[in-house]
Regions:
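Active-site Gly/Thr loop motif
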Residues: 227-232, 671-678
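Primarily the internal scaffold of c-type cytochrome electron-transfer domains
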Residues: 48, 52-72, 174-176, 212-217, ...
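Primarily short, surface-exposed interaction patches in extracytoplasmic proteins
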Residues: 76-146, 161-210, 269, 313-322, ...
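A structural supersecondary motif
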Residues: 666-669, 677-687
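Solvent-exposed helix-loop boundary motif
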Residues: 1-40, 48-86, 90, 102-107, ...
Length: 778
């Protein structure tokens, strides 16, 4: 091994440094004798590593690792405008004028709730001339339950949320949707971001554990998962841990921490030792389905389930005994179909079989089945009558089985043990509480206080080459002082390592967590972050366009209680946010062609889900039901035929049950909804902070030919006809108000009426769905 603590002579590291093994290290020259002796003594004394190493880049030399400074805004009014204006003045750029009120109301609705305003909502704002009309509009939208659907979707991208496992089997995750609803609810309640992270990383280790905090731990469990049991493929555990670390790194810290799995990070000061200390903080996890019921309800469920199991087991034993003589009579005829050597092997008593005979006999005996209908045909009438009576009684008893208790698919750590008759598969907590899925086994907690299983440094990331045992820890370059590594709860039933990890992440001394989140919020309002690489604040990422503003926002975010809604208010009340997007200034274009300095508002194409939701809202078909189990919109049979495994509970008809908001669509990793995938739905296997935005021909083809779009165009036409029967001009005006939140101008009205003179109203409605103005926020 490279390093054997306590024995330098068996450590390849020492032997190569001393020239005892080839190739001698380091390359280019031998170490001094005193250095070689120091290495020998260090290894012989246990190779204790205190982590005191100078990183390649320190917090003093790289902007992202420095603690934020609450800079004084360089001007009056909204501090955002002061910081942005300073950069514009330095470049001699004149900003765009304010956008129209009609543009602003549509922008606000799409930004905050992901739905266009109705004509009445638009008119209400346009007619409200009070000085605080804009602020009151923002408050109404932040109070809407649809706010959580819109902004929760952004976090679900980061959390790589899906309703299936992925890979070749892509099995269903029947309780994953509860995590989605938790996220939506947390955004609606404006749960402070630091608490939001605590609940997701260590919701089972907090002082006050709630059903919501247990559901929240599904964040770490959202990884894609192969369909093999961990006990058969232990290396999979390291893949899941790597996914957790990658998600925490990219999604929370804005760092590619996973790049340090096999070696020190090539660009950022993240050591391989840091990676495995983080892994040790997570290593004790087990997947559990936390029952979301009170202890008394769980006890009652267990009691009734045990009674049903006992009675059904008793009846099945009687039934098997009744069938066994007939099964024994039918088996010889089935064995006779095999070659003579196989029949001979079966005929030899089990204790006397040779290894070869044991292999042959075992394969055949396990593979041969006598089916119930075969037994029925040879049974005596009185036995057949008794069999049917027993089967009916079993069915009757099964009907008394209590419904499965609701559970949260999350994680915990603790001394969980499989029951002797369990398959040793994925755990579910609490003896006697079953998971809703068919897989899994009963578990029970072991006695006493929890002992974390050992985790190891993996040499070159190889799970088969373990180095020194690791203790929990954090990324050194952004760690100040000596934060606790474990915060075990009083019960002692978990390690408290994840709680300590969460507290380190949300500590005011951590320079990245708040900085990354305010940058994400900024990105979703402006289409580009102050740091454009949302998931990478490291050396290979982009530098901030407004570093002083980013620092100020980070400190404000923490000072305002980590409130995301406070950040929305701050951003949306700025003149920077309210600027027009259509502003062709030659000087500004030449000095800042990418609009990095925000001299105008950045026009943005809507996300895939918002395009679908807007179509439903405009057609009048949108089902606004909040939360619950996922929906399964209709997918073409040809696409379903390509699905390898898993389920797609196709709706019987493309109707209201499937016309809910897109955040509730079943997210199958192996089969994204084609309509959404075309418009850049992100890969659900990895954390995604910023979606790709493409412009490809298939998007136009989908909007022209997709069955869903055509159906909604017809419903849109029906809505126009019902509102203004036979009056084409009123229908055109209403169509513009519904789809674009403005009336048509004279030229648009004339073109629309000319179109309707030759085409159907549904064709005109279809055209409205294809307009760039409908598909973009301006």
């Amino acid at each position: 091994m490279a390093l054997v603590p306590g024995n330098a002579q068996k450590s390849r590291m020492y032997r190569m440094a001393a020239g005892l093994d080839k190739p001698a290290m380091p390359m280019g020259g031998k170490l001094k004798a005193e250095d070689i002796e120091a290495i020998r003594l260090w290894i012989d004394q246990g190779a204790v590593w205190d982590g005191a190493v100078k990183p390649l880049v320190t917090e003093a030399t790289y902007w992202a690792f420095r603690k934020p400074v609450h800079n004084t805004p360089p001007g009056e009014g909204n501090p955002i405008d002061a910081f942005v204006g300073k950069e514009l003045r330095a470049k001699g750029i004149k900003p765009a004028p304010p956008a129209s009120r009609a543009t602003l109301v549509r922008r606000a609705y799409l930004d905050l709730i992901g739905l266009p305003p109705t004509p009445a909502e638009t008119a209400g704002f346009l007619n409200d001339r009070a000085p605080d009309a804009w602020e009151r509009l923002i408050e109404r939208l932040l109070a809407s339950p649809h706010y959580g659907e819109r902004w929760g979707r952004h976090w679900l991208d980061v959390a790589r949320y899906a309703d299936s496992n992925g890979f070749e089997h892509d099995f269903d995750r029947p309780n994953a949707w509860r995590y989605r609803d938790y996220v939506i609810g947390a955004f609606n309640k404006d749960t402070p971001y630091d608490q939001f992270l605590r609940e997701q990383i260590a919701g089972d280790e907090l002082e006050s554990v709630t059903p919501e905090s247990l559901i929240a731990t599904g964040f770490l469990r959202n990884y894609a998962k192969v369909g093999y049991r961990e006990k058969d493929n232990p290396e999979n555990r390291y893949e899941y841990l790597d996914d957790m670390i990658a998600t925490l790194g990219r999604g929370v810290l804005g760092l590619t921490v996973q790049c340090a799995r096999c070696h020190d990070h090539k660009f950022d000061p993240i050591r391989q030792m840091d990676y495995y200390r983080l892994q040790a903080s997570l290593f004790g996890y087990v997947e559990v389905d936390h029952p979301l019921v009170s202890p008394s309800e769980a006890a009652e469920y267990e009691k009734k389930t045990s009674e049903v199991d006992a009675r059904v087991g008793e009846l099945r034993r009687v039934l098997r005994a009744l069938e066994q003589p007939y099964r024994d009579r039918l088996l010889p005829a089935k064995y006779a179909k095999f070659p003579r050597n196989v029949q001979d092997a079966i005929a030899v008593p089990e204790a006397q079989r040779t290894p070869g005979q044991m292999l042959l006999a075992d394969q055949v005996i396990r593979g041969v089945t006598v089916f119930p209908d075969e037994i029925d045909r040879v049974m005596k009438p009185e036995d057949l009558k008794e069999k049917r009576r027993l089967s009916a009684e079993i069915a009757q008893v099964e009907r008394t089985r209590p419904k499965p208790v609701p559970v949260a698919a999350g994680i915990t750590d603790g001394d969980y043990r499989f029951t002797p008759d369990g398959p040793g598969d994925e755990p579910a907590p609490g003896k006697g509480v079953k998971r809703e899925a068919i897989e899994g086994s009963f578990l029970f907690r072991g006695p006493g206080r929890y002992q974390t299983p050992p985790s190891y440094f993996l040499i070159r990331g190889d799970v088969n080459t373990k180095g020194a045992q690791m203790q929990p820890g954090f990324i050194q370059v952004i760690t100040e002082g000596n934060p606790p590594l474990e915060l075990p709860p009083a019960s002692g039933q978990t390690s408290g390592r994840r709680r300590a990890l969460a507290e380190w992440l949300v500590s005011p001394d951590n320079p990245l967590t708040a900085r990354v989140m305010v940058n994400r919020i900024w990105h979703h309002h402006f289409g580009r972050g102050i740091v454009s690489t949302l998931d990478n604040f490291g050396k290979m990422g982009d530098s901030p366009t407004h570093p002083e503003l980013l620092d100020w926002l980070e400190v404000e975010f923490m000072n305002r209680g980590w409130s995301m809604k406070q950040m929305h208010r701050l951003i949306m009340t700025s003149d920077t946010y309210k600027r027009a997007s259509e502003y062709a200034d030659a000087g500004a274009m030449s000095k800042d062609p990418e609009n990095r300095l925000l001299w105008r508002y950045r026009e943005r194409r809507l996300d895939a889900e918002i395009i679908r939701d807007s179509i439903l809202a405009v057609s009048g078909a949108l089902n606004r039901e909040i939360g619950g189990r996922p929906i399964f919109p209709k997918i073409q049979a040809e696409v379903l035929a390509s699905m390898q495994n898993g389920i797609w509970k196709q709706s019987k008809q493309d109707g209201p049950e499937a016309w809910r908001r897109s955040v509730y669509i079943y997210r199958k990793r192996g089969l994204p909804l084609p309509m959404l995938e075309i418009f850049d739905l992100p890969n659900q296997n990895i954390s995604c902070g910023a979606r790709n935005v493409s412009t490809v021909p298939t998007q136009a083809l989908a909007l022209m030919n997709d069955d869903f779009v055509l159906r909604q165009a017809q419903l849109f036409a029906n809505r126009l006809q019902e509102a203004a029967p036979g009056d084409l001009q009123k229908q055109v005006d209403l169509a513009y108000q519904l789809a674009l939140n403005r009336p048509p101008d004279a030229s648009e009205r004339r073109l629309a009426l000319d179109f309707l003179a030759q085409h159907t109203l549904s064709g005109f409605a279809h055209v409205m769905f294809n307009l760039n103005e409908f598909l973009y926020a301006r």
